[in-house]
């Protein structure tokens, strides 16, 4: 199943994250519709987190570093199903995921609900080179330091996701 393109149908949700209607992805901001996304942080066996640098051709956040995988949920899709789908589509990875929580944040004036998961994988591959400029494993300490010294190198969503994963893991981001 391909990643949701501009005309893919996604759920517009209310302020409690309950579905209201279905809208084309490309209209979510113009309609001021709340929506859902999923982010997965992938860790390797030594505890490094996989970062994805978005392609310079991307419409939103070109060249910025973000979560290992991220994307919109298809209409009717669960967060966990979207996490598995995006791992397969973007990294060629099939694995279990652990839920870290759901984050509510504002994106261009609308609310998005971000389902956050972690997993382990040592050898992901860039399965979408037009979408992803590069992948890089980085130590959690390095990421934490870069988020302080150069926050604009990262997407706003990743900054929040990483913080939530660290909180959920007792101040130490990890897959467990």
Task: Label every model-predicted segment.
Residues 37-69:
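A glycine-rich, hydrophobic loop/mini-helix early in the fold
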Residues 1-4, 174-176:
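Basic/polar N-terminal segments that are highly enriched at the extreme N-terminus
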Residues 50-51, 68-100:
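The catalytic Nudix box helix
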